[in-house]
A protein has these predicted regions:
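Conserved D-loop-proximal element of ABC-family nucleotide-binding domains
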Residues: 257-258
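Phosphate-binding P-loop
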Residues: 26-32, 239-242, 270
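H-loop/switch region of ABC-family ATPase nucleotide-binding domains
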Residues: 281-283
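Walker B catalytic acidic pair
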Residues: 250-252
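Phosphate-coordinating catalytic segments in nucleotide- and nucleic-acid-processing enzymes
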Residues: 2-16, 55-247, 309-347
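Pre-Walker A-like glycine/lysine-rich segment at the N-terminus of P-loop NTPase domains
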Residues: 8-53
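Loop/turn-to-beta-strand initiation segments
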Residues: 243-245, 275-279
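Conserved hydrophobic alpha-helix in the ABC-type ATPase nucleotide-binding domain
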Residues: 263-264
Length: 347
């Protein structure tokens, strides 16, 4: 059904982290559809997504879970040991586990671990069961406008970008799918094209937006929000986002015109209905609410709130509806604004 006709992947089902970056110990269950991560800055939303993405990438034989994690977090001296949570109880060992329907992969490392030389658990079975998995991570900052020669500059050590930026450029450069667009794929592309006013073109390692019959525009000259929409167009067009793939999107609402937020919510729900497992982190009330408003009865949506308890430990709460989250900084801020607005009106 629909255009996303790839192999149905094995959705990720949970992540466990102990003494890893900001986490003392946490278990986060994932829904097989759209997972919306909320929480204030510094509670590890992006960390969880990067860790899950590293596990997805490790489904390929030539990618190691620990090395990918290191390249996504970019600690000093590429030392994974620097990702150990420096807590007061003296435990200097971190453990991480990512599970899917079919397999699991884990790693253990300590502050003394050299480079990314972590101990990996169950890697072979993970590679065997998950080898068909495609995953893509869209970072919060738009990068396609800087794609030209970025790989080379990073390799030479002239600039530092973590792997999420290099990976998204590589994914966007994939040769456009030669197949005629199916009705379902066309539906997505038309919606996105209307917003971004054009199609993406790649020439000499540089990205352009081509509006209809007009001359192509350098990505630098296109508003950043539109570049994000154009990137999504490209990933659907070239087949990177298909049934069974996993999409991680860090703050999709950043720099996007508020009038396009409902369309963005609708697209995420449409992709979820095509069996793409999605993780988005957001601070945006409108995106969170529009996902709620646009969902259908069949939509598989889970809200995940990360928050600090009284002791400062990061905890996790999940709910099937946005309003049901007890720890919800987005809602709290919205209510506060509403109360202040009422107060002004009553003066």
């Amino acid at each position: 059904n629909g255009y996303l006709s790839g192999v149905i992947g094995m959705p990720l089902t949970k992540i466990e982290a102990e003494n890893f970056t900001v986490f003392k110990d946490i278990t986060i269950p994932f829904g097989k559809g759209l997972n919306v991560l909320v929480g204030e800055n510094g509670v590890g939303k992006t960390h969880i997504m990067k860790l899950a993405y590293a596990a997805c990438k490790a489904s390929k034989h030539d990618v190691s879970f620990s090395q990918k994690t290191t390249m996504l977090f970019r600690p000093d001296q590429s030392s994974i040991g620097r990702l150990v949570n420096r807590n007061k109880n003296g435990n200097n060992t971190a453990k991480v586990l990512v599970e899917s329907d079919a397999a699991k992969i884990g790693m253990t490392f300590s502050t003394k671990t050299r480079k990314w030389d972590a101990e990996i658990q169950a890697e072979e079975n993970w590679e065997k069961q998950m080898s068909d998995l495609t995953s893509v991570f869209i970072p919060a900052k738009e990068i396609l406008s800087n794609a030209w020669n970025l790989d080379a500059a990073v390799k030479m050590g002239n600039v530092e970008f973590d792997d999420s930026y290099l990976d998204i450029i590589a994914a966007a450069k994939i040769d456009i799918s030669r197949d005629v667009d199916s009705a379902s794929r066309k539906k997505y592309l038309d919606i996105l094209q209307k917003i971004s006013n054009g199609k993406v073109a790649l020439q000499d390692d540089r990205f352009y937006l081509k509006p209809g019959t007009q001359a192509k525009l350098e990505f630098n000259l296109v508003a950043e929000g539109l570049r994000k929409i154009a990137l999504l167009w490209q990933l659907i067009k070239n087949g990177t986002l298909e049934k069974g793939s996993v999409l991680f999107w860090d703050e999709p609402e950043a720099n996007i015109n508020p009038k396009y937020i409902p369309v963005l919510a609708e697209l995420l729900i449409m992709l979820e209905s095509e069996r793409v497992q999605i993780f988005v982190s957001t601070h945006d009330y409108f995106l969170s609410k529009y996902i709620e408003v646009k969902r259908t009865e069949d939509s598989n949506i889970q809200y995940i709130s990360l928050y600090k308890d009284e002791t400062g430990k990061i905890q996790c709460e999940t709910a099937s509806e946005f309003e049901l989250l007890e720890h919800n900084t987005i809602m709290d801020t919205f209510r506060k604004l509403y109360r202040e607005e009422i107060g002004v009106a009553l003066k």
